[in-house]
Amino acid sequence: MVSWIWRRLRGKKRSVMAFCLLMVLSAVAVIHFPPGHPASTPGLNPMEPRGEVGASDPRIQQTLNSSLRQPARNLGHWTGQALPRNPILVCAKKQSRRRQVDRSRHPLSVRRDAILSAQDRELLLEGEVRDAGGAALGQPGHNGLVQETQSKTVTMVVPLTERSHESFQAQRDTAAASFRPWPADGRDPLPGAKNGVLTGGKAGSATSGSEAPWWSSSAEDLQKSPWCGTETPGLAGTAAWGQVPPWFMEHDAQTLRLLVHGKVVGKARVPAHGQVLQVGLSAGDALQDISPLRLSQFCSQGLCGLIKRSKDLHEVLSFHLDRVLGLQRSLPAVARSFHSPLLPYRYTDGSVRPIIWWAPDVQHLRDPDEDQNSLALGWLQYQALLARGCKWPGQIPCLGIHHAEWARLALFDFLLQVHDRLDRYCCGFEPEPSDPCVEEGLREKCRNPEELRLVHILVRSSDPSRLVYIDNAGNLQHPEDKLNFRLLEGIDGFPESAVKVLASGCLQNLLFKSLQMDQVFWESQGGAAGLKHVLETLESRGQILLRHIKKHNLTLFRDKDP
């Protein structure tokens, strides 16, 4: 029996030896292979196993499916399933094969992560535009299609507001700081003021000055001021924006720097205004040719302007007149030559054009016939408001605009002879045959006052009790014997601060100094010699207005009066 067993074992000797050798090799493999892989993929913990090839963690799939709702993140955290704690020979072989596959897969996985991260950020950026641009969708130039798109995507961008908004906030603050003017000596031109947001707040604060006018003393004191002299030390001959006159608020200074130096990063047509182009402006080399949705976001943050025709250059002069008089109702405007490849050739042919700041919260009626107004107002209703205000309930609707606003508007329009707002039908003077009111047959409606409508009566949602002035080019060639006194009809008082400036005789010198801040406009008009006539015209009209006030014994009100 023993000899038979021995013969059987000798027959199996080779198999036993092979089995033993295999066991030794498996033991070596178990000892030398670690239970986890090194972190060859960025962001992977060295002790985190990868799992099976082609299998991803459910969290990764959730991230990919919700890329529009989640902030951009590192997609390199592929976690997989854990390996067994007590591997056997078969597991060791599978682990070795899996490691080889992982090595060959690593470059592709990094590339995939980079692509996914870039796509994720791009999608998030578009979602942010739709969300942040919502503030501007109610403004002119945004159609219902965009509004519908925004309404469909708002739920996708809610979770990312914190990080994405902070990113854009930083970009906006950087732009505002870059455009802030500083004097040559390094002093803050507006001591105690802080950088403001270009969208502004109330019309009586960041966007249109404080309640107190820049000059609250008497006309005689203004005459003694260095600003009324023929030259102001440190101002004449200096570079543009070297020193800021006191009638400009900090928001003005920031916005003017934006309009002068901002790089065009996008454009859009303004419906029903073929000669006007809306452009987005940015500091530095941030973006180029941004999408309409991104442009909407720029405009909602106060980083846009309207490029108008060269014939509208006097809107720049009108803006400076508004600030010198302390009215603070016109939107900032500068003259500029454009060279951006994003603009059509007619905008880059070297001609000087005005660019007006785009206020993001100007309200427009949805009625196509009244889209240039914030409220519908006829001439008879306007006269009733001037006569009785809101003291007679049930007689006329109260519009919520301060009574004194109409006096400021009338003074401004009379000096510039702007007819479009209060007398677009030219009922108060004899127009030229080439005037639009004649060419369009509007003057025939003067026979029926009930048909007369006011135009460009606009307010901002930030302060709907105050008017905002647009399209202020006016008519500085209008002869004195044809001045339109209908613009003053029904007005029983004027702002005291503006009347003081007119009575001081300093208007011409103040405007000279103010306009020197816009070197492009100054040079385009031929400097002091070229501007002398138009400034004398404004000075003369101011004296005529003073005589009108004295003749009719009209009152003066302080700027704080509603």
UniProtKB/Swiss-Prot annotation:
Tissue spec. comment: Expressed in tracheal serous gland, heart, muscle, fat, lung, ovary, liver, kidney, adrenal gland and brain (at protein level).
Sites annotated Cleavage: 111-112, 423-424
Localization: Secreted; Endoplasmic reticulum; Golgi apparatus; Membrane, Caveola
Domain of life: Eukaryota
Signal peptide (residue range): 1-29
Keyword Endoplasmic reticulum: yes
Region (Disordered) residue spans: 179-229
Pfam families: FAM198
Keywords: Endoplasmic reticulum, Golgi apparatus, Membrane, Secreted, Signal
Residues making up the propeptide: 30-111, 424-562
GO cellular component entries: caveola; endoplasmic reticulum; extracellular region; Golgi apparatus
Post-translational modification: Proteolytically cleaved. Cleaved at Arg-112 and Arg-424 leading to a processed mature product of 35 kDa. The cleavage takes place in the Golgi apparatus.
Xref: InterPro entries: FAM198
Residue ranges crossing the lipid bilayer per the database entry: none
UniProt family annotation: Belongs to the GASK family.
Descriptive protein name: Golgi-associated kinase 1A
Source organism (scientific name): Mus musculus (Mouse)
Record lineage: Eukaryota, Metazoa, Chordata, Craniata, Vertebrata
